[in-house]
């Protein structure tokens, strides 16, 4: 029964487990952010079906948040039921690519469950980031824009293209 070094484990051709579990908050607060075997399989599916195709099309993908243990989710004010805690979601950007263009490409080409253009300001291509989840089975194909209004995060369905948001 050989112990696997999860830090260098490949999830797909260009993504490692360490990239998907890295958290400065977890390190600072001493929170265990290591996924179990089932969660690692879900992260592989996320990489193979979403992140790797995005990288193949656009180039470098900067993952800002991947797997978050329930304890980490609670520590940052997120939900214990977050798709990040289920190893089904990642937040990311592609350097030099407008986040609306990136989201529209994912919508048109990949089997996402939930796709959220987070805190994107139309006309500011570098604003915000993409939250995308993948699940086995039938995805919801939920396409949303998250934005701040009166100090709260609001969600609005995107009908058509994110690049047409006003």
Stretches with model-predicted labels:
Residues 4-55, 148-166:
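Extracytoplasmic cell-surface/polysaccharide-interacting catalytic and binding patches
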Residues 81-101:
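Acidic, His- and aromatic-enriched active-site or binding-groove loops in soluble protein domains
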Residues 62-64, 89-94, 131:
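Structural recognition of the beta-strand scaffold that forms the well-ordered cores
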Residues 49-77:
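Extended, low-complexity, intrinsically disordered C-terminal regulatory tails
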Residues 6-8, 94-166:
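Catalytic cores and adjacent binding grooves of peptidoglycan-active enzymes
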């Amino acid at each position: 029964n050989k112990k696997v070094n999860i830090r260098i484990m490949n999830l797909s051709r260009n993504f490692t487990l360490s990239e998907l579990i890295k958290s400065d908050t977890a390190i600072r607060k001493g929170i265990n952010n290591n996924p179990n075997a089932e969660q690692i399989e879900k992260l592989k599916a996320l990489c193979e079906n979403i992140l790797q195709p995005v990288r193949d099309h656009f180039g470098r993908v900067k993952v800002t948040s991947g797997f978050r243990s329930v304890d980490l989710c609670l520590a940052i004010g997120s939900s214990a039921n977050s798709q990040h805690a289920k190893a089904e979601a990642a937040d990311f950007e592609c350097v030099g690519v407008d986040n609306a263009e990136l989201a529209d490409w994912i919508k048109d080409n990949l089997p996402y469950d939930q796709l959220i253009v987070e805190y994107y300001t139309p006309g500011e291509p570098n604003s915000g980031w993409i939250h995308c989840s993948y699940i086995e089975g039938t995805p919801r194909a939920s396409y949303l824009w998250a934005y701040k209004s009166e100090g709260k995060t609001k969600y609005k369905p995107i009908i058509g293209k994110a690049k047409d948001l006003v």
